[in-house]
């Protein structure tokens, strides 16, 4: 069969699949997409089923029930279930900055220019999905961002709201000129501008149709000082991911972290007083810790106000060739927990998580063939949640309760929505966690993090008068395009405005603040302008 004949048959098959999907939608019938694809492929004698991207491309732009069809065809709906499209990009490979002080990298770190995986960035192998996309793009930020946005769009996702995650080691240790160009290109990828000037790129990004709602930067406590925090505000950064790995000073020293746990706690306070959301990386099963100390360190982490971050990534220790830990393992001086013990530990950690914390990840994305010892399965979260069911405990972190995830995994919808408030002290400040929830079904629709800063805050926007700080405002549910509404979804239904009004009331009458400021993604500034906020340095502020 000629190439043109095959292309014609594939196009015909895609059109028939779309027609049957529209018919089933009209008749309110549930249809098995895989069975439909196989039947149509067999009819046209195709050797393989049409790809999802081809079927999506075959839907006419003015098709009746297009949005409903897209929901059925969307690949990996979890990607935008939280209301935004997350786009991970990597900076160029560079050496870890603390090699200059300690003489080497952390004992468990697999990547970097001096490792067995020499074309990879620090702490990555080069075989993770994000790493492979970065290598294909030769670490060009513009190519990485455009490629990933187009890929998500072709898979049926709404990509009007994008959050960047900058991975690949300590970004803030790279030269300033490289950092500025890198961030400018990320903003250009959404706005279509071609400027190399950082401030100009940010201005264009504010007006862009595809909004940059936030940037997350991976860093270390020694690259999270005043000057680094100020620089990241200029980029449009709203969240920091800080490598902690352990709350024990002896473990930080023995694993060659190059910083103390005391420095970590000081960084958390500084970052939160500047308005950032703080996410940490923690590693259970490190050398010389043991099960009892592991459980105790997570109790300490969630209960001690010196820690208590907004989010957490759990990375159980992996033994990978070329690392110091690999040598310890090979000579019998280190041994991982058994798979059953590890699942048990993760289940016990998840039971401790407070409702204002989000568990972003539970294991690394490193391919199993590269792992000499450690996690043996790719579904550790699922196994841990099943173990929790057996033990009669429940995970109440944000991700487990948010409305988008409940719809994707359990097809559960909220019924009676209420405003809930939780207050706690953390990192020298008073934190208020406001949320709209269905308490009966334990479903979270939207949240707001309000902070009365500690007296160590240094930003001039906050020191001249008492100021309260909104560090996060997020309404969950599948992503809805900007300027659009969907009565079946929760974004753009007014929950964000209501949460902000309550935050303003608390700031004025309970904190005694004269001003309320929001750390806002570059693309979200117009939203706050409509609510009476004005640009105040890198923040959006309103006098109370």
From Swiss-Prot:
Q: Which residues cross the membrane?
A: none
The annotated pathway is:
tRNA modification; 5-methoxycarbonylmethyl-2-thiouridine-tRNA biosynthesis
Does the keyword Iron feature in the UniProt annotation? yes
Q: Which biological process annotations from GO are given for this protein?
A: regulation of cytoplasmic translational fidelity; tRNA wobble base 5-methoxycarbonylmethyl-2-thiouridinylation
Chain sites annotated for binding [4Fe-4S] cluster? 96, 106, 109
Cross-referenced Pfam families: ELP3_N, Radical_SAM, Radical_SAM_C
**InterPro entries per the UniProt record, alphabetical:** Acyl_CoA_acyltransferase (IPR016181), ELP3 (IPR039661), ELP3-like (IPR034687), ELP3-like_N (IPR056591), Elp3/MiaA/NifB-like_rSAM (IPR006638), GNAT_dom (IPR000182), Radical_SAM_C (IPR032432), rSAM (IPR007197)
Question: What cellular-component terms does GO give this entry?
Answer: cytoplasm; cytosol; elongator holoenzyme complex; nucleus
Q: Which UniProt keywords apply?
A: 4Fe-4S, Acyltransferase, Cytoplasm, Iron, Iron-sulfur, Metal-binding, RNA-binding, S-adenosyl-L-methionine, Transferase, tRNA processing, tRNA-binding
Gene3D superfamilies from the entry?
3.40.630.30
Q: Cite the EC number.
A: 2.3.1.311
Where found in the cell? Answer: Cytoplasm
What does this protein need as cofactor? [4Fe-4S] cluster
The positions annotated for binding acetyl-CoA are 161, 472-475, 495-497, 528
Q: How is the cofactor bound?
A: Binds 1 [4Fe-4S] cluster. The cluster is coordinated with 3 cysteines and an exchangeable S-adenosyl-L-methionine.
Q: Which reaction does it catalyse?
A: uridine(34) in tRNA + acetyl-CoA + S-adenosyl-L-methionine + H2O = 5-(carboxymethyl)uridine(34) in tRNA + 5'-deoxyadenosine + L-methionine + CoA + 2 H(+)
| Domain N-acetyltransferase as annotated: residue spans | 393-544
Mutant phenotype after disruption: Sensitive to methyl methanesulfonate (MMS, causes DNA breaks), thiabendazole (TBZ), sirolimus (TORC1 inhibitor), thermal stress, and cold. Abnormal septation during thermal stress. Global protein levels are unaffected.
Keyword Transferase in record: yes
Role of this protein: Catalytic tRNA acetyltransferase subunit of the elongator complex which is required for multiple tRNA modifications, including mcm5U (5-methoxycarbonylmethyl uridine), mcm5s2U (5-methoxycarbonylmethyl-2-thiouridine), and ncm5U (5-carbamoylmethyl uridine). In the elongator complex, acts as a tRNA uridine(34) acetyltransferase, which mediates formation of carboxymethyluridine in the wobble base at position 34 in tRNAs.
Task: Give the multimer and partner information.
Answer: Component of the elongator complex.
By sequence similarity, the record places it as follows: Belongs to the ELP3 family.
Put simply, this protein is called Elongator complex protein 3
Q: Which organism is it from?
A: Schizosaccharomyces pombe (strain 972 / ATCC 24843)
């Amino acid at each position: 069969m000629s190439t043109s004949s095959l292309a014609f048959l594939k196009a015909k098959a895609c059109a028939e699949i779309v027609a049957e999907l529209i018919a089933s939608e009209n008749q309110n019938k549930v249809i098995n997409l895989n069975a439909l694809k196989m039947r149509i492929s067999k009819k046209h004698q195709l050797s393989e089923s049409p790809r999802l991207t081809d079927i999506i491309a075959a839907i006419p732009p003015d098709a009746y029930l297009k949005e409903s069809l897209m929901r059925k065809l969307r690949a990996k709906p979890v990607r935008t279930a939280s209301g935004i499209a997350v786009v991970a990009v990597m900076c160029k490979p560079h050496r870890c900055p603390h090699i200059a002080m300690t003489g080497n990298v952390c004992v468990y770190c697999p990547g970097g220019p001096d490792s067995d995986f020499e074309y990879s960035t620090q702490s990555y192998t080069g075989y993770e999905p994000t790493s492979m996309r970065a290598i294909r793009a030769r670490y060009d930020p513009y190519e990485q961002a455009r490629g990933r946005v187009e890929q998500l769009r072709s898979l049926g996702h709404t990509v009007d709201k994008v959050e960047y995650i900058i991975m690949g080691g300590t970004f803030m240790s790279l030269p300033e000129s490289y950092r500025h160009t890198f961030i400018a290109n990320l903003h250009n990828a959404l706005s279509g501008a071609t400027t190399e000037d950082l401030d100009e790129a940010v201005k264009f990004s504010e007006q862009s149709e595809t909004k940059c709602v936030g940037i997350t930067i991976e860093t270390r406590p020694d690259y999270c000082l005043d000057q680094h925090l100020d620089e990241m505000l200029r980029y449009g950064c709203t969240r920091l991911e800080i490598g902690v790995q352990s709350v024990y000073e002896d473990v930080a020293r023995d694993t060659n972290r190059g910083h103390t746990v005391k420095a970590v706690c000081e960084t958390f306070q500084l970052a939160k007083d500047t308005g950032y959301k703080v996410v940490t990386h923690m590693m259970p099963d490190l050398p010389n810790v043991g099960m009892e100390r592991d459980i105790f360190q997570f109790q300490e982490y969630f209960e001690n106000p010196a820690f208590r971050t907004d989010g957490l990534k759990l990375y159980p220790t992996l033994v990978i060739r070329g690392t110091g830990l690999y040598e310890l393992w090979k000579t019998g001086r280190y041994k991982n927990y058994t798979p059953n013990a590890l699942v048990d530990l993760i289940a016990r950690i998840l039971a401790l998580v407070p409702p204002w914390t989000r568990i972003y990840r539970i294991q690394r994305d490193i391919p199993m063939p590269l792992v000499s010892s450690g996690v043996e399965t790719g579904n550790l979260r699922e196994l841990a949640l099943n173990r929790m069911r057996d033990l009669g405990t429940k995970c109440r972190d944000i991700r487990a309760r948010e409305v988008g995830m409940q719809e994707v995994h359990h097809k559960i919808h909220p019924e009676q929505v209420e405003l809930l408030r939780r207050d706690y002290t953390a990192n020298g400040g008073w934190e208020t966690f406001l949320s709209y929830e269905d308490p009966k079904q334990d479903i979270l629709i939207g949240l707001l993090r309000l902070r009365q800063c500690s007296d160590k805050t240094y930003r001039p926007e906050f020191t001249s008068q008492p100021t309260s700080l909104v560090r996060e405002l997020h309404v969950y549910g599948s992503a809805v395009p900007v300027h659009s509404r969907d009565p079946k979804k929760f974004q753009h239904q007014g929950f964000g405005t209501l949460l902000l009004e309550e935050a303003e009331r608390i700031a004025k009458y309970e904190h005694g603040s004269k001003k309320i400021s929001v750390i806002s993604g570059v693309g979200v500034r117009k939203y706050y302008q409509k609510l009476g906020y004005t640009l105040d340095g890198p923040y959006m502020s309103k006098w109370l």
